[in-house]
């Protein structure tokens, strides 16, 4: 067995982990998360955290969990500066010092990896943002014997960010959703990041996410997510950034979770409770595509990767009501940007040979499409006569006219007059043959 390493490998794929939801977690919860992540081909977790009084104890449990498992899996801290904008740099330095020499702490060029969420406007009393992070943070850590690889997530101009902020050794770009548009997400900004990271001999971490939807009183919007998982992965496979971060492992409040739902989590409540759009809406079946997409990225291929087992797979995602339906009992309005969603069932296919896919609800055929061998995607509308086709979707795999496999979706699609609460999250299933 190969010895464990703390070096974050080239083309590592890591997942964003929301430590703020782990107040009730035991070490066993973290161990389960790590084991599940390893089974999906992930190389590590990016531990996003704020300044909660209990946070250090939970971060310690996460690192302890990695030690106890003694498996190849890396961790690094991600300072959530949206929560810690007034925290002194000396406190942030202490956080990094606490875990810098742990056995599963990720390193690049033997330097401790540290990220942020925001922080691009904080100077810690220095003359500039660059000087602030350099003097009060990086230099302070270096004086304590800890050299870091600083890779913040700062939403700034990709064409100048590397040149303007040399304090960073690399950057992560957060935005991977189509913001307030019905057009598919673009990789134009990624290409600028990649070009400039190479020009400055630095690194770039791109991001991928399955969906975005949140439905709180003060935060109520969705982004066009139909087909996003496939589209974004295929972009990153083509573009080949240094690293990829999956957004997210466990953010239930924003529906971006790709890991199995852990009900020990402290589900966010802001007027409404995120249990309303997460319970029964597991994304785990979609997560089973992760090992395949990760291997495609690492092997730089848009065809079937080497870890494809030969068993064909159809991954299905869909919302349970039309974007135009009116909820009868929701105290919160329909989410902002709802109109840019698409009333379709999205599928991703990893198949050894071509086939025909037929999708129906209660005997009404919604669509029939020919799917080629390899890695493909398709969308089928669930609207019939200007309303959602109510019932449980049936997915049939046909060879000619012979059904060779079939499966139902996990949840009924609701008719336009049957929606009680809005939910723009999607449910998922997988069919194998």
UniProtKB/Swiss-Prot annotation:
It is found in: Ascus epiplasm. InterPro entries: Glyco_hydro_71 (IPR005197). The keyword Cell cycle applies. It comes from the Eukaryota. GO terms for molecular function: glucan endo-1,3-alpha-glucosidase activity. The keyword Mitochondrion does not apply. Its EC number is 3.2.1.59. GO terms for cellular component: ascus epiplasm; cytosol; mating projection actin fusion focus; nucleus. Keywords: Cell cycle, Cell division, Glycosidase, Hydrolase. One of its GO terms (biological process) is ascospore release from ascus. Disruption phenotype: Abolishes ascospore release from ascus during sporulation. Disulfide bonds: none annotated. It is an enzyme of class 3 (hydrolase). Coiled coil: none annotated. It catalyses: Endohydrolysis of (1->3)-alpha-D-glucosidic linkages in isolichenin, pseudonigeran and nigeran. Belongs to the glycosyl hydrolase 71 family. Promotes the release of ascospores from asci by hydrolyzing 1,3-alpha-glucan in the ascus wall. This is Ascus wall endo-1,3-alpha-glucanase.
